[in-house]
Amino acid sequence: MSNKGTERVKRGMAEMQKGGVIMDVVNAEQAKIAEEAGAVAVMALERVPADIRAAGGVARMADPRIVEEVQNAVTIPVMAKARIGHIVEARVLEALGVDYIDESEVLTPADEEFHLNKNEYTVPFVCGCRDLGEATRRIAEGASMLRTKGEPGTGNIVEAVRHMRKVNAQIRKVAAMSEDELMTEAKNLGAPYELLLQIKKDGKLPVVNFAAGGVATPADAALMMQLGADGVFVGSGIFKSDNPAKFAKAIVEATTHFTDYGLIAELSKELGTAMKGIEISNLLPEERMQERGW
């Protein structure tokens, strides 16, 4: 019997997170705060993206001890990041029993030409995308869940908005095309034809697509849900704020009740200072994490 997780099971696990918030944590204490706030899963890593950005150098998979401490601290699913194309980091995380692996541009890529063949793993994967071409290539490789790349560690929502709007606009374009136009569109996007055909018929991606990269306030989370996100990843925004526990609960509530503006106003009161943001135009080309991968 194959030890590879089936596509249906992997995608079903991602569907169970729909409508929720997944939070980056670096220790057991933060993981407990996230779970108590209502997070549907946590991402265990050594440093949040803002600290990875500030430190520079090569960012790698977290120490397995951190992953195990987080696993032992919570009952919700635990995710962890592997470098793009790093087969062994992914296998190590699979051996640790994580519930999901993020093949992440937040870490320094191990392979600038090839992403992981995620179909070969039992554990499901989440990957980032900026457009429908990237989205469908990752799905073809076996990704069971997508997220916008945004610009991690900046506290600036503008790139996540751009990526979510672009993917959804391209889905609408494909859905309106005749089948004889799809092959040319597949060529233009660098997208597998069969996946575009499925997207045309269904009018949506075959996997969930969360928002990530720059979510820093309850209003940011609600905005991404209104733009069509299936849920929200929050990296640096929570534990770089003045009051992480209160901030975490507020973002979870805003994600759930994303059209209740009165509630979002109440949730946004007296949260303290949000993380200090970065203007995207001030980043050098080599500092733009979203450019990693293809």
UniProtKB/Swiss-Prot annotation:
The keyword Secreted does not apply. D-ribose 5-phosphate binds at D24, G153, G214, G235, S236. It comes from the Bacteria. It is an enzyme of class 4 (lyase). Pfam families: SOR_SNZ. Keywords: Lyase, Pyridoxal phosphate, Schiff base. The active site is at K81. It catalyses: aldehydo-D-ribose 5-phosphate + D-glyceraldehyde 3-phosphate + L-glutamine = pyridoxal 5'-phosphate + L-glutamate + phosphate + 3 H2O + H(+). Its EC number is 4.3.3.6. GO terms for biological process: amino acid metabolic process; pyridoxal phosphate biosynthetic process; pyridoxine biosynthetic process. D-glyceraldehyde 3-phosphate binds at R165. The keyword Nucleus does not apply. Pathway: Cofactor biosynthesis; pyridoxal 5'-phosphate biosynthesis. GO terms for molecular function: pyridoxal 5'-phosphate synthase (glutamine hydrolysing) activity. Catalyzes the formation of pyridoxal 5'-phosphate from ribose 5-phosphate (RBP), glyceraldehyde 3-phosphate (G3P) and ammonia. The ammonia is provided by the PdxT subunit. Can also use ribulose 5-phosphate and dihydroxyacetone phosphate as substrates, resulting from enzyme-catalyzed isomerization of RBP and G3P, respectively. In the presence of PdxT, forms a dodecamer of heterodimers. NCBIfam families: PRK04180.1, pyridoxal 5'-phosphate synthase lyase subunit PdxS. Belongs to the PdxS/SNZ family. This is Pyridoxal 5'-phosphate synthase subunit PdxS. It comes from Bacillus pumilus (strain SAFR-032). The gene is pdxS.
